[in-house]
């Protein structure tokens, strides 16, 4: 199976740019209902992600009392590389291992351009549909995911 099967293309993904203001980022996050959003640079390269907590800490650290105060600062100030992308040719078991720890996995092409995301929800939905029920057994997952899960339970 190819990871493109799970890909949500960039034009269907809510994302921010490094030059978006904190206010724009907060509004986009509120309107989308997401708790974390990918960020790209002006050339379309994946720059990282921002989470709700990143906004909160920046607001608290700067003492903002009005959202309009966040209009002069950009997402660049809070973007993080905690969520690392996978290349388009990444093996499915590596994708599944990454999806264990993050809500979505950013996907980049050979030029490091952001091409979309794969959500943990879509992966789980696929396995539920494939299995015909909501009971998912370890046999449905590659061995590397099973060993990653086992190490988390220690």
State where each predicted segment sits.
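Tandem CBS (Bateman) regulatory domains
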Residues: 1-12, 51-102, 119-154
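Acidic (E/D-rich), amphipathic helical modules within compact regulatory domains
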Residues: 23-66
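Short glycine/threonine-rich beta-strand-turn micro-motifs
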Residues: 46, 113-114
